[in-house]
Amino acid sequence: MLKHVCKFMLIAGLITALSGCLSLGHLNYKQARMLKKQGFTLTEEGWTLRLPEKLLFGFDQSDIQAAQKPALEALSKQLQQYNLNKIKVVGHTDNIGDPSYNQTLSEKRASTVSQIFIETGFETQNIQTMGRGTSQPLVENSSEENRVLNRRVNIIIP
């Protein structure tokens, strides 16, 4: 009997340990699998997709490049198909230029991306849009290559 109890305790411990490795946040397996396929990663804020500036915008611009709009529309529709109807869109910039200008630019870029999601069926109240300007760089702004990485818009499934 004691042998069976020990075996049961060992199995229960392993299951508990492994379940921590398979954290999906609050999502089901299919939702998490789709997000991973799209390039999302699980972060402290939620499932996050980083959209680099060079793919979406021209330098110092907040209008989406026409070639990128269909990909954002498809992403929006796919999120809705998987009942992922609440998102946060966050704009970021590098540290070149006036901080208040960068803050405004990050807000405009996030708003532009949000508008595409609204046009493809997201309800306005289910999208939180914000700019963080220069406040959260991915890497130090010590080179042009690093500054490019810091100019981005993140889509977050909270």
Where are the model-predicted features located?
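Periplasmic OmpA-like peptidoglycan-binding domain that tethers envelope proteins to the cell wall
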Residues: 92-158
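Early exported N-terminus immediately downstream of N-terminal targeting peptides
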Residues: 49-55
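Short, well-ordered coil/turn elements that cap or connect secondary structure elements
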Residues: 16, 35, 82, 122-124, ...
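Conserved beta-strand core positions
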Residues: 47, 85-87, 127, 153
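Core alpha-helical elements of the protein kinase catalytic domain
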Residues: 19, 77, 114-115
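Periplasmic peptidoglycan-binding/anchoring modules of Gram-negative envelope and division proteins
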Residues: 34-36, 41-42, 56-90, 118, ...
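N-terminal targeting leaders that direct proteins to extracytoplasmic destinations
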Residues: 1-47, 63, 70
